[in-house]
Amino acid sequence: MPQQSQPAPQPAPQPQPVPLHRARHTAESFGTDPQRYDRARPRYPDDLVARIVAGSPGPDVPDVLDVLDVGCGTGIAARQFAAAGCTVLGVEPDARMAEFARARGLPVEVATFEAWEPAGRTFDAVIAAQSWHWVDPVAGAEKAARVLRPHGRLAVFGHVFEPPAEVAEPFAAAYRRAAPDSPFSGQPARRPLETYQAGYAKIADRIRETGRFEDPEQWRFDWQRSYTREEWLELLPTTGGLTRLRPEQLAAVLGAVGHAIDALGGRFTMRYTTLATTAVRTGAD
């Protein structure tokens, strides 16, 4: 009898990556060393802060803007908005980061934005500095609309940094060797800016879907900063791919990057782009 052909084996389904807003272990790993985080992380362009303040909440700007900072961390952006004359309340899921921010004068309530209870409070602006990817994008946009006053502004922003290839490639290679099982190990040495711009465009889509905002705008601020070897090695452990490494893994990565910077003379110039998606809440409740 002729043999029946067997169906070809099907490849095992690949696990889908966990959305970042559900990756709570990573989201709450930044508080491991809040002092280093606050010391090393770059501030936001003054022009960005000024533009948000000037554009909130629209035709009836009060003397002092009430700003809600979602995922405020150690209060880097919040302090900049306070210096611009705003009253700022932080919401932060990591109690260690919240305590650091409180010690520097920022009132902070510990919760995820989705679970946070506004208790009837409303704001002229809701900002999220380098934090919106840890928030459910649909629930976050809906909640922002609920707590914003009519004509208030939602502003989601963050940095994209592009180290020179002489620094980025040794980092990526060392990371793959040190942490081959990490979900971050497969990322390219340098991700194109367009990748991040596409992410901010998706944020705009989620904002549109609420039907409670005017059409979102995309803002861009380009700038540069020079880093010494010590300054960059201070910042690297505060980034998401490194906050959960074991000490020996982290040491291996930092050693390779330090050697690469030494080969450049101990200093390099980082190109930054700060991207923002922002939208004004409609006047209708």
Outline where the language-model segments fall.
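Conserved class I S-adenosyl-L-methionine
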Residues: 2-63
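Conserved Class I S-adenosyl-L-methionine
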Residues: 3, 194-285
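A short, conserved alpha-helix within the catalytic core of class I
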Residues: 135-144
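Class I SAM-dependent methyltransferase SAM/SAH-binding core
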Residues: 66-70, 74-116
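A short acidic, Gly/Pro-enriched loop at the edge of an enzyme's catalytic core
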Residues: 116-126
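Nucleotide donor/acceptor-binding cores
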Residues: 64-65, 121
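Conserved catalytic/acceptor-binding region of the Class I
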Residues: 146-222
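Short catalytic micro-motifs in class I SAM-dependent methyltransferases
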Residues: 130
